[in-house]
């Protein structure tokens, strides 16, 4: 070999590694969602781009080749968005029955937030015994004591959605005081504060209240402020079903603002509304009061459901003193003729001292009975209180008292209380997110033994279909922000709510042209349509509109967790 040939060989050998470095092997991903219109959860305009998933994280947003992925999803013509967050879930028991969370997943919900007043911990033996006694169609063992133990139980049991919870102020009160109408002693209040501290350090999101219901109704504002001061130290939030959504709506907002200010804690209003036709004209003042507080520096937000009917118990027709001492005391009172006459007189009398949903509905034909504990009464499911009263030949109020006593439960009930005009006024507000105020459901098994509110199947897709595509109340980027990025930010959820590199891969793919709700008040057990694919922590839970059976959901924790 001459010198020139030797020199050429040495040069080629030296350059070989550089040539290889110029073209590194293509990065590999578990999933690439190709060609979809990507809405990142910020509210910014969408863009057509690919989304790559590796493990439980979003690995990148750019143009990838199909060869780079084990699985490729063709999303051309479809919307790709962060998974939705249900700010008010009552799936506390339904997830034990069926961890697949079918109705939620088929709407694109990937995280369920619990804890409206009552939470699944902390519990003592007395509370556990009562919970077992009060169980309806869903039966389960209580294998936990604290709220964090319950969330870990769900995770180990297997759930398709992520789960997180506020600690219920009612649960804290019940643990220490019981169900009686009395105020805590200084020692009891300190015990309540200590329970809050332990749950916040274990990962609770903050304090949740439901102040129209006994025994929460018995708590004074000062008690709530003291509990919230503890939660605030752990960057928690106060979230409330306020003391009134009707006659005393504006005063109830004042109470929430006072708690937020004095405890130095962000506050959120559950299912914001002006309930009862005489109060519909308060919606503008309600929204203005909140926005004035925001301008003054308070961190106030809200959530809502997308229907004009509320759902709670038939016992919400009765004055709160009837439940002093709990349900056994209520049932005893309802069987006493003299006490019944007193109750009936109070139900018929307009008042500002308690939230009377019988009068707020305006008529017993706007009170729909949706779920009974007793097999004997289940045939009445789906009938109005007016219909049942006529069947029995009795006054509607007497009928309501009879039914509660016979069923020995609060009886699931739907009340038609709100105006569509106000729903639209609320839905456009950039600080309002969404919560179903329902349990996850499925059109099978124990779930078919009662009629849920249709919001269990349709709350979130109704935002995308009815209010965005059809009525154009929102743009799609606005709607998706309110379903994902906004609640994730409000809750301080770590690396959730946005489609960005490094975020957890909670991702939904849906057809904007067909997405929508099918559930009705007459036939609520009907899945939403238009949701194509759903990923939770990188695992595919919905594929081509069908549940895969995967249960990759995790317990999520508040920012104060130690």
What are these regions (language model features)?
Residues 198-255:
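Divalent metal-binding pocket/active-site signature
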Residues 23-29, 38, 42-83, 98, ...:
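Histidine-rich, glycine-flanked metal-binding segment
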Residues 36, 336, 425-431, 437, ...:
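C-terminal cap of metal-dependent C-N hydrolases
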Residues 150-154, 159-186, 190-213, 228, ...:
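Active-site neighborhoods of metal-dependent hydrolases
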Residues 8-17:
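Bacterial N-terminal signal peptides
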Residues 1-8:
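Bacterial N-terminal signal peptides that target proteins for export
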Residues 75-80, 84-85, 89, 95-206, ...:
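Divalent-metal coordination cores built from histidine and acidic residues
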Residues 38-50, 411-418, 422-423, 471-481, ...:
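Acidic, glycine-enriched loop/beta-strand segments at the rims
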């Amino acid at each position: 070999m001459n010198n020139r040939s030797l020199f050429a060989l040495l040069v080629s050998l030296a350059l070989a590694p550089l040539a290889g470095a110029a073209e590194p092997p293509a990065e590999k991903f578990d999933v690439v969602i190709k060609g979809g219109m990507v809405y990142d959860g910020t509210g910014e305009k969408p863009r057509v781009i690919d989304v790559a998933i590796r493990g439980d994280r979003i690995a990148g947003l750019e143009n990838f080749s199909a060869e780079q992925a084990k699985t490729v999803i063709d999303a051309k013509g479809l919307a790709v968005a962060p998974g939705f967050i249900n700010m008010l879930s009552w799936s506390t028991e339904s997830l034990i029955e069926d961890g697949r969370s079918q109705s939620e997943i088929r709407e694109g919900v990937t995280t369920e937030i619990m804890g409206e007043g009552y939470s699944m911990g902390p519990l003592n033996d007395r509370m556990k015994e009562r919970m077992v006694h009060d169980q309806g169609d869903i039966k389960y063992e209580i294998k936990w004591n604290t709220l964090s133990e319950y969330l870990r139980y769900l995770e180990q049991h297997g759930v398709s959605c992520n789960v997180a919870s506020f600690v219920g102020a009612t649960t804290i009160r019940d643990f220490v005081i019981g169900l009686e109408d009395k105020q805590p002693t200084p020692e009891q209040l300190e015990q309540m504060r200590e329970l809050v501290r332990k749950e916040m350090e274990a990962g609770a999101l903050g304090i949740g209240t439901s102040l129209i219901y006994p025994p929460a109704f018995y708590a004074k504002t000062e008690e709530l402020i003291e509990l919230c001061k503890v939660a605030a130290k752990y960057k928690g939030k106060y979230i409330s079903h306020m003391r009134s959504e009707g006659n005393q709506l504006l005063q109830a907002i004042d109470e929430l603002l006072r708690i937020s200010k004095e405890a130095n804690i962000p506050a959120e209003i559950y299912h914001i509304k002006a309930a009862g036709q005489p109060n519909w004209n308060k919606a503008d003042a309600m929204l203005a009061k909140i926005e004035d507080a925001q301008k003054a520096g308070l961190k106030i937000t809200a959530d809502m459901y997308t229907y004009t009917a509320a759902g709670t118990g038939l016992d919400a027709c009765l004055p709160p003193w009837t439940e002093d001492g709990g349900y056994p005391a209520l049932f005893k009172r309802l069987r006493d003729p003299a006490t019944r006459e007193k109750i009936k007189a109070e139900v018929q009398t307009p008042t500002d001292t308690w939230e009377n949903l019988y009068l707020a509905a305006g008529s017993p034909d706007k009170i729909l009975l949706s779920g009974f504990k007793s097999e004997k009464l289940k045939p009445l499911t789906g009938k109005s209180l007016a219909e049942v009263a006529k069947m029995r030949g009795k006054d509607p109020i007497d009928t309501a008292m009879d039914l509660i006593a016979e069923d020995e439960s609060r009886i699931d009930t739907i009340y038609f209380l709100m105006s569509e005009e106000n729903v639209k006024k609320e839905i456009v507000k950039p600080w309002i997110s969404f919560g179903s105020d329902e349990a996850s459901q499925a059109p099978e098994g124990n779930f078919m033994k009662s009629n849920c509110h249709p919001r269990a199947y349709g709350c979130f897709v109704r935002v995308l279909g009815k209010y965005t595509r059809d009525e154009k109340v929102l743009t799609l980027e606005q709607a998706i922000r309110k379903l994902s990025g906004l609640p994730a930010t409000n809750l301080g959820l770590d690396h959730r709510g946005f489609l960005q590199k490094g975020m957890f891969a909670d991702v939904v793919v849906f057809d904007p042209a067909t997405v929508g709700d099918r559930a009705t008040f007459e036939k609520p057990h009907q899945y939403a349509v238009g949701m194509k694919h759903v990923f939770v922590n990188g695992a595919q839970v919905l594929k081509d509109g069908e549940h895969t059976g995967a249960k990759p959901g995790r317990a999520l924790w508040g920012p104060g967790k130690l």
